[in-house]
């Protein structure tokens, strides 16, 4: 489904949803690129096997004709095998050369110092080539083991895990959990606690975090009857790093904002692009030396029922 047609396509589906839970009903799945103006599509799976946090399970099917409820659905998914270890070798090569990267960092620094922008996030790419086909199932299991509290995803070869919730809308309630400001984790509890304390007290990281919070709040507020956030940031720890995070919760005014419109309005946040957004993105496009593609974009899962 083309992104420009996604809302209308979903709205025109006739739904028989006896589960009536977040995520039930037809679900569009996709990844919005860092530059959301680039062409991108969403997928409507014909078969979804779902499980909620409270243990409920259900199956969603997409049919061209009405399904007789007395019919049974044959879930012949075949045997599910745990991934096995491979003897693959890997070659790591840089994408953008170090000179281009350092030039981009210098350009961003100078733009901030001159007052042209408040922030810009510069990235560089690395290519890892395997001697054997990469088992995505194995990658996802590793991500689940290491980043179990994060959102794991696999969309058409775009695989990862993120602890950040850009935006969720359920029955008119809007929530977001932006992250910005980061410190490493070492695996030693005492050292990590010290790093977390330093992160919370860091003026630089608190400013960086507040830029993101203000941007998300100011973007969503025109659609809300109220929108509030936690008075202080908290630590969100994952396997290798820890972030500053702030939960945001509000109520949408009617007519309710569509979650796709919210995603496009928010993305990319200053945590991944910069601020002001248009100026920062223009600088990134001029100096970064690569196309980010879906990196730094957003994974999205949209259910019609919610």
Predicted feature residues:
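Conserved hydrophobic/aromatic pocket- or pore-lining residues that grip, position, or stack substrates
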Residues: 115, 167, 214
């Amino acid at each position: 489904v083309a992104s420009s047609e996604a809302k209308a396509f979903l709205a025109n589906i006739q739904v028989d949803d006896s589960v009536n839970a977040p995520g039930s009903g037809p679900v569009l799945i996709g990844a919005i690129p860092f530059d959301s103006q680039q062409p991108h599509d969403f997928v409507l799976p014909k078969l979804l096997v779902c499980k909620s946090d409270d243990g409920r399970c259900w199956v969603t099917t997409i049919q061209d004709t009405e399904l007789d409820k007395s019919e049974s659905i044959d879930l012949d998914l075949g045997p599910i095998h745990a991934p096995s270890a491979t003897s693959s070798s890997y070659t790591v090569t840089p994408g953008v050369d170090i000179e281009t990267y350092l030039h981009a960092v210098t350009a961003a620094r100078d733009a901030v110092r001159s007052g042209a922008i408040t922030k810009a996030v510069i990235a560089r790419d690395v290519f890892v080539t395997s001697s054997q086909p990469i088992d995505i199932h194995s990658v996802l299991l590793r991500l689940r083991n290491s980043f179990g509290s994060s959102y794991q995803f696999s969309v058409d070869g775009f695989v990862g895990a993120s602890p950040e919730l850009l935006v969720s809308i359920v029955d008119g309630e809007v929530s977001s959990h932006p992250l910005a400001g980061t410190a490493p984790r070492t695996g030693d509890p005492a050292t990590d606690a010290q790093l977390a304390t330093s992160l919370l007290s860091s003026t630089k990281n608190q400013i960086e975090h507040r830029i993101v919070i203000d941007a998300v709040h100011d973007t969503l507020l025109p659609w809300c009857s109220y929108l509030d956030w936690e008075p202080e940031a908290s630590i969100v720890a994952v396997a290798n790093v820890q972030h500053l995070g702030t939960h945001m919760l509000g109520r949408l005014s009617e007519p309710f904002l569509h979650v796709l419109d919210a995603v496009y309005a928010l993305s990319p946040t200053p945590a991944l692009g910069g601020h002001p957004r248009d100026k920062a993105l223009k600088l990134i496009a001029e100096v970064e030396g690569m196309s980010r593609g879906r990196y730094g974009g957003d994974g999205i899962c949209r259910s019609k029922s919610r």
